[in-house]
Amino acid sequence: MEYIKFDKARKMDIVPIGRVAIDFNPIDINKPLSESSTFKKYLGGSPANIAVGLARLGKKIGFIGKVSKDQFGEFVVNYFDNEGIDTSQIKYSKNGENLGLTFTEIASPTESSILMYRQGIADLELNVDEIDEEYIKNTKAIVISGTALAKSPSREAALKALELAKRNNTVVIFDVDYRAYNWKNSDEIAIYYSIAGKQSDIIMGSREEFDLMEKLITREKNSDEETAKRWLDYGNKIVVIKHGKEGSTAYTSDGKSYNIKPFPVKLLKSFGGGDAYASAFLYGLLEGWSIIDSLEFGSASAAMLVASHSCSQDMPTVEAIRNFIKEEKEEYGDMVARA
């Protein structure tokens, strides 16, 4: 069954909106961040990583956001240009706002943490006047990042993009992408997440992120099935609830559910997999694949990313993911990731 109908006549496939940052990942891994002294610079931020992931998979991708007017901002735009991502809707900050900086800790393959500098940053200064309806009208889907809702004026810009997408029958994908930075309190999180979640067509988030979104809706913590039903009843066609190393489940508007497990892989780090998962899953949907095949592709891409040093730079191609799945199935069996 085709749950999402993408307008194939449109120029762009997907346009993420929101956070773009600079990641500094330690070269000297397997030690605390306080002891790391050498880092490698990468493009970062979930929406930006998803954009790169989809571009690597051969899709026509744009990006709506704001970057600093300095060398880091130039790095982002040049990186996107080199990946074939349209940068016509990337604006430069005018009041000295900086790009967010992220320093990662890879203490062990299973112990990773992230230190973000998110004050006075450019991406949260995107304003409503910088959202172009014609651009949204010419893309099959937009990805709204939850971090774009954390603070004004980015909050209103993201919600305007959502409203324009609905008006122009552009598919809305809500990637919850919770980061504690910049939010004032949990009530604020619940309010704005719910606004986006009630108007989207696809929601992707972890169990913990859905708990934050539902804080003001219910006093009790819901089961995955109860959560999925709630957001499907609001009009979503697909709700994906992730449980990290336990796998994830996609719930669909016809009452069905599809489970996928992680592929066995030797971990290097425990972050970055979610963006690769989202990119490859959305690629499958754009290709018209079944939900389970799209989930499998996403799980494979995620496994490849957590075994590599970066998030953006190591996003795989379609051929690489297919080869990975083939090798995994030859070693572990055809049902290696399928629950």
Curated annotation (Swiss-Prot):
Its EC number is 2.7.1.92. CDD domains: KdgK. Gene3D superfamilies: 3.40.1190.20, putative 5-dehydro-2- deoxygluconokinase. It comes from the Bacteria. Keywords: ATP-binding, Kinase, Nucleotide-binding, Transferase. GO terms for biological process: inositol catabolic process. GO terms for molecular function: 5-dehydro-2-deoxygluconokinase activity; ATP binding. Pathway: Polyol metabolism; myo-inositol degradation into acetyl-CoA; acetyl-CoA from myo-inositol: step 5/7. It catalyses: 5-dehydro-2-deoxy-D-gluconate + ATP = 6-phospho-5-dehydro-2-deoxy-D-gluconate + ADP + H(+). Catalyzes the phosphorylation of 5-dehydro-2-deoxy-D-gluconate (2-deoxy-5-keto-D-gluconate or DKG) to 6-phospho-5-dehydro-2-deoxy-D-gluconate (DKGP). Belongs to the carbohydrate kinase PfkB family. This is 5-dehydro-2-deoxygluconokinase.
